[in-house]
């Protein structure tokens, strides 16, 4: 989402407060605004496509982009420029091969809705967009699906659309807290830690897959691309799936 130019800090605060309330209601399986509006001459407070549905594990995550802290000319849009972490000010790291397009990049506020029911996700984002009408506009959106990434050694590593296990060496909840604190959570002493402590950063990428070419590669070529066995996920030179991958 982008916040309208000229919007005040008070308007931004009011929007985030209303979004928070609506998110709490939707994650609890309730209608936005509570009971349905009985006034037939007024617009419903909830769009209704999940009426009677369970939230199915709905979570809603919010993040702030660099442009929320400072405008294109460096202006302090909402009085929070001094709170911008250096990582946002200097720009998020780029991946080799990135071909970022302006229409799919950046934004003032990002909203991620996750659920075991895609209609619940769509309902959540739709209602937040409805609430923000006049204060925010949708900059870009992306629907997705897939098993959740494995966050515990008790879970099977999920597969990506190339057919390979993806995330074998990700941090797990059983890892020492020091590992999570170093690689995942912002700490009190970190840049921005005075307000971002316990939070994290999000980088999102849309991957262009030439599936029709990939699907016709020999198995050996596919496995050498990832350095892992396609069936079991182990590195080609090791029997253990959790061993470091072959480079």
Predicted regions span which residues?
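Long, histidine/aromatic-enriched segments associated with O2/redox biology
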Residues: 1-247
């Amino acid at each position: 989402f982008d916040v309208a130019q000229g919007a005040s800090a008070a308007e931004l605060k009011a929007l985030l407060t209303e979004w928070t309330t609506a998110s709490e209601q939707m994650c609890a399986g309730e209608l936005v605004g509570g009971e349905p509006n009985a006034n037939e001459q007024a617009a419903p407070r909830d769009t209704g496509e999940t009426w009677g549905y369970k939230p199915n594990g709905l979570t809603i995550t919010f993040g702030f982009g660099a442009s929320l802290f400072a405008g294109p000319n460096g202006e302090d849009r909402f009085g929070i420029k001094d709170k911008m972490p250096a990582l946002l000010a200097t720009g998020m790291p780029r991946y080799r091969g990135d071909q970022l397009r302006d229409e799919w990049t950046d934004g003032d506020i990002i909203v991620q809705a996750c659920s075991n029911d895609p209609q619940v996700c769509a309902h959540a984002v739709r209602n937040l967009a409805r609430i923000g009408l006049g204060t925010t506009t949708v900059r870009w959106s992306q629907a997705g699906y897939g098993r959740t990434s494995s966050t515990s050694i008790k879970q099977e590593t999920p597969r990506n659309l190339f057919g390979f296990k993806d995330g074998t060496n990700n941090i797990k909840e059983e890892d020492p807290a020091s590992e999570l604190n170093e690689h995942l959570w912002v700490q009190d002493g970190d840049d921005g830690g005075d307000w971002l402590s316990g939070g994290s950063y999000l980088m999102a990428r849309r991957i262009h897959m030439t599936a029709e070419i990939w699907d016709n590669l020999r198995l050996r070529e596919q496995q050498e691309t990832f350095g892992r066995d396609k069936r079991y996920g182990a590195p080609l030179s090791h029997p253990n799936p959790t061993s470091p991958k072959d480079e």
